[in-house]
């Protein structure tokens, strides 16, 4: 069975192995054992309540319980930019006009921005390529919304997600070559690694503070502004079906889009509800425990021992019927409450 739970120290080796499969461009999961160990400790301290909001970050793992192996990760940063500045580019417009010359021209422009300071961020989503099936990807991504819904008081009024921008098969970023390289004089992979390991001072020191005219960039750089890496297209689609949208902000390194939404308007947060657990073995006549039913995300309401699974079921009342195996995976007993939401919006066909 596949289940999502909070990260533990024993997961370090598996996460380090996963980090080696990400490739260039995923700044939040570098293959650096010391950094990953510190990331795990920060998550544990977040759950223990010993950090300020600007330092808090939750890290979840997807575990294959049969193999006893972590095969995916996803995370939530509680409030970005409160300790280290949070940078991106806002794609805006400057107008140049002259009545005397009868000239009026609007020019697309990149403005360095800290507009998302204080927002909660969905980040560090990565699934082992061998497990990109059976709806594991949407499960690992959307389970964070159930956690946010259950513990809404810990999160901002807005949620954002920086999507990995376009790089070619050699890890080359056209956007970086046309923008970042001129100011940093280092390779994209190096800047990507430094940022991912928390060494971000160079961004503030070297990034241009004045607007950049998009028309001055190379054509291939202009073409990838707001575009995602091909491997990130499914992750973007998952978030967009939940209500997150691109509002004209892009990553300063690779030009990838930032998606955002009001937290309470996210479909899985808004539509999630509680059910009371009933435990019974599967019966062919049982309409509720049905392998052909709609797919649902189901999670317990235990903050420190959060668990979530995917299950097929039909909802007929305020109760949720679980098999003993599902109840054990969730860590719940009969009479406990669980939070549930359909994996996909009712109008979305999967």
UniProtKB/Swiss-Prot annotation:
The keyword rRNA-binding does not apply. It catalyses: succinyl-CoA + L-arginine = N(2)-succinyl-L-arginine + CoA + H(+). The active site is at 229 (proton donor). Gene3D superfamilies: 2.40.40.20. SUPFAM superfamilies: Acyl-CoA N-acyltransferases (Nat). One of its GO terms (biological process) is arginine catabolic process to glutamate. InterPro entries: Acyl_CoA_acyltransferase, Arg_succinylTrfase_AstA/AruG, Arginine_N-succinylTrfase. Coiled coil: none annotated. It is an enzyme of class 2 (transferase). The keyword Coiled coil does not apply. It comes from the Bacteria. Its EC number is 2.3.1.109. Pathway: Amino-acid degradation; L-arginine degradation via AST pathway; L-glutamate and succinate from L-arginine: step 1/5. Keywords: Acyltransferase, Arginine metabolism, Transferase. One of its GO terms (molecular function) is arginine N-succinyltransferase activity. Succinyl-CoA binds at residue 125. PANTHER family: ARGININE N-SUCCINYLTRANSFERASE, N-SUCCINYLARGININE DIHYDROLASE. Belongs to the arginine N-succinyltransferase family. Catalyzes the transfer of succinyl-CoA to arginine to produce N(2)-succinylarginine. NCBIfam families: arg_catab_AOST, arg_catab_AstA, PRK10456.1. This is Arginine N-succinyltransferase. The gene is astA.
């Amino acid at each position: 069975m596949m289940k999502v739970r909070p990260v533990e120290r024993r997961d370090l080796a598996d996460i380090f192995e996963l980090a080696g499969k990400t490739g260039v461009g995923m700044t939040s999961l570098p293959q650096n054992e010391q950094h990953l160990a510190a990331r795990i400790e920060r998550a544990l301290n977040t759950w223990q309540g010993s950090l300020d909001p600007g330092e808090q970050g939750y890290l979840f793992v997807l575990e294959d319980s049969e193999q006893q192996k972590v095969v995916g990760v996803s995370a939530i940063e509680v409030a970005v930019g409160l300790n280290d500045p949070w940078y991106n580019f806002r794609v805006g417009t400057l107008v140049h006009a002259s009545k005397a010359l009868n000239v009026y021209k609007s020019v697309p422009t990149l403005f360095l921005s800290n507009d998302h300071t204080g927002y909660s961020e969905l980040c560090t989503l990565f699934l082992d390529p061998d497990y990109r099936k059976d709806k594991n990807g949407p499960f690992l991504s959307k389970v964070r919304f159930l956690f946010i819904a259950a513990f809404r008081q810990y999160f901002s009024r807005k949620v954002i997600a920086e999507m990995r921008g376009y790089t070619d098969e050699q890890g080359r970023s056209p956007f970086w070559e046309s923008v970042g390289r001129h100011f940093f004089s280092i390779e994209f992979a190096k800047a990507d690694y430094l940022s991912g390991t928390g060494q971000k001072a160079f961004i503030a020191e070297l990034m241009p503070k004045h607007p950049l005219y998009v028309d001055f960039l190379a054509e291939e750089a202009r073409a990838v502004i707001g575009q995602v890496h091909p491997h990130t297209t499914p992750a973007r689609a998952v978030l967009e079906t939940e209500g997150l949208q691109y509002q004209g902000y892009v990553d300063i390194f690779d030009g990838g889009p930032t998606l955002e939404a009001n937290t309470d308007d996210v479909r899985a947060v808004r539509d999630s509800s509680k059910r009371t657990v009933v435990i019974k073995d599967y019966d062919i006549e049982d309409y509720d425990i049905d392998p052909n039913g709609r797919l649902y995300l189901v999670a317990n309401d235990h903050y420190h021992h959060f668990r979530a699974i995917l299950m097929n079921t039909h909802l007929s009342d305020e109760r949720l019927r679980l098999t003993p195996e599902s109840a054990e995976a969730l860590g719940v007993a009969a009479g406990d409450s669980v939070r549930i939401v359909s994996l996909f919006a009712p109008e979305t066909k999967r």
